[in-house]
Amino acid sequence: MSHMEKIKKYYEENNVEGYPDYYILGWESEAAQELRFKQLVGDIDLNGKTILDVGCGTGNLLEYISRQFKTFNYTGSDVLPHMIQRAGEKKLDGKFICMDLFKSNPYGNKTFDVVFSSGIFNLNLENNQEFLMDAVDIFQNLAREAVSFNLLWDKSKDKDPKYFYFSPEEVQENLSSKYRDTWRVSIIKGYLHNDFTVHLS
């Protein structure tokens, strides 16, 4: 089974009519999802910014941002058509595109002020470390001001083999080494027992 087939199978099995968004997206609760969003945004002032949300799902991050900020330009991308359809049905103030950014990137360097991504590195694809570094390379090329994403923490007490868990220390070392001349890498921990957030600024 290819990586894309794994991703589609996982999320299509979760796509149950009438179930809440957090379940469809594979999160444990709406409260946990909100905590993740709070850390993703952090102290970034998004007013007047252009935003790319990679793996936008059903548009929940846009809903969160819209409660905090009023003037911004949001684009969400996802590889799954049913996610984009559900996001579009909400009539939110943003643009949703079904595409695989990692196969075909239509954007030029520094197109967006901020790039967010929540949850796309969670499934165990057997090459997660490589995928992470390749993805961050794309994110930082697209972003003018900041990149923010979250990962599952290898100190989680309830690990599941279908997910991949990262070491915050290793991630910080690898990214700081690669982008020492261009980005400051920060790790945020402690808001959930199984999750941490990475900021490039």
Name each model feature, range by range.
Residues L52, G59-K103:
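Class I SAM-dependent methyltransferase SAM/SAH-binding core
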Residues K103-N109:
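Short conserved loop adjoining the S-adenosyl-L-methionine
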Residues Y163-Y179:
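Short alpha-helix
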Residues A143-L152:
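Conserved beta-strand signature within the Rossmann-like core of class I S-adenosyl-L-methionine
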